[in-house]
Amino acid sequence: MTRVVLASASKGRLGVLRQAGIDPQVIVSAVDEDTLLAALDPDLPPEAVVAKLATAKALSVAAELPDELLADCVVIGCDSMLFLDGTLRGKPGSAEAARAQWESMAGSAGHLLTGHALLRISGGVITHTEGDTGSTKVHFGKPAEDEITRYVDSGEPIHVAGAFTLNGLGGWFVDRIEGDPSNVIGLSLPLVHRLVRRTGLSISDLWQR
């Protein structure tokens, strides 16, 4: 059976896959995102930035796979960032940065970009390298000052792309989205479906129920 490896520590991505019938092996990549971002061409389009980060994560994990997975598996790497007002925004990393981000994006709309990289590995060899970037437009509401304070104090927005989650407390402050909701959570099911088919597999080959 072809195993699925998720090259991410994201609980959101893991939840999306599990709800869709796939219980992946989770192996977190050792990629230093800040270092990689600093080395990228500053003129790269935002979609290419998240795609390169996703590919780096997938390749990093593929290089460390145990033999039982190298025999037959699919590795999925992802990276999400919010593109708003001409700027790519990743994880705030601190309460102060999360608050500043919410104060600037309240009442605005941006695009949640998720780069996807999918590696098909068979017999210890990478036979397919597929990738694409999903984009979903997110319209943010205008939370009150005390709501922003309590949201930041919850800790949720500090370590997630764009300082919000659609399927958590942050969902209260999203007015609407245009596009794929699973992409906002961090892994686009329709996009991964397309990538899997490019490798010659059917997504149903990967289901575990």
Swiss-Prot record:
<protein>
    <recommendedName>
        <fullName>Nucleoside triphosphate pyrophosphatase</fullName>
        <ecNumber>3.6.1.9</ecNumber>
    </recommendedName>
</protein>
<keyword id="KW-0963">Cytoplasm</keyword>
<comment type="function">
    <text>Nucleoside triphosphate pyrophosphatase. May have a dual role in cell division arrest and in preventing the incorporation of modified nucleotides into cellular nucleic acids.</text>
</comment>
<keyword id="KW-0546">Nucleotide metabolism</keyword>
<comment type="similarity">
    <text>Belongs to the Maf family.</text>
</comment>
<dbReference type="GO" id="GO:0047429">
    <property type="term" value="F:nucleoside triphosphate diphosphatase activity"/>
</dbReference>
<keyword id="KW-0378">Hydrolase</keyword>
<dbReference type="InterPro" id="IPR003697">
    <property type="entry name" value="Maf-like"/>
</dbReference>
<dbReference type="InterPro" id="IPR029001">
    <property type="entry name" value="ITPase-like_fam"/>
</dbReference>
<dbReference type="GO" id="GO:0009117">
    <property type="term" value="P:nucleotide metabolic process"/>
</dbReference>
<dbReference type="GO" id="GO:0005737">
    <property type="term" value="C:cytoplasm"/>
</dbReference>
<dbReference type="Pfam" id="PF02545">
    <property type="entry name" value="Maf"/>
</dbReference>
<feature type="active site" description="Proton acceptor">
    <location>
        <position position="79"/>
    </location>
</feature>
